[in-house]
Regions:
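Conserved catalytic or regulatory cores that recognize and/or transform ribose-phosphate-containing ligands
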Residues: 1-138
Length: 138
């Protein structure tokens, strides 16, 4: 089970999660299914979001705990405050891999945190390439 944590920016950022879901779907077989938890929602309302926000937060926390692997993708042009919070929550677990370009405004925070807790940090490879080379190749 893989959780796709990272930049969403209220739906304004690149939809990298759907790309990863499609890539995994195209490359997996019925004999080796992979469950993917994608927190991005297409049905987010424009008006009152109060109830849905709480529901979404609880869903994400629950599914990050259930996941065997958390792929965290931080886009360089984003602030990603929730992603930074999630990095702090899950950095001591042995199931997190972080993708973050070195032009991210808080790259040093991400780098030092990952180093301290032994979290793999990939700043030179796109998440799509990693998924193809490391996850789907196994």
């Amino acid at each position: 089970k893989i959780f796709l944590a990272g930049t969403i920016d209220n739906g304004d950022s690149e939809d990298w999660q759907t790309k990863i879901c499609k890539l995994i779907e195209e490359c997996t077989t019925n004999s080796k299914p992979i469950a993917v938890y994608n927190p991005r929602r297409d049905d987010w309302p424009e008006d009152d979001q109060t109830k849905l926000i709480e529901e979404q937060i609880k869903w994400e926390l629950e599914h990050m705990e259930k996941a065997d692997l958390i792929l965290m993708n931080i886009c360089g042009d984003s602030k990603s405050p929730i992603t930074l919070l999630e990095l702090g929550i899950h950095s001591k677990e042995n199931k997190l891999i972080v993708f973050c370009p070195d032009n991210f405004y808080r790259f040093d925070n991400v780098k030092v945190t990952c180093e301290r807790y032994g979290v793999p940090l990939i700043s030179t490879k796109k998440i799509e390439d990693f998924v193809k080379d490391k996850i789907l190749a196994e």
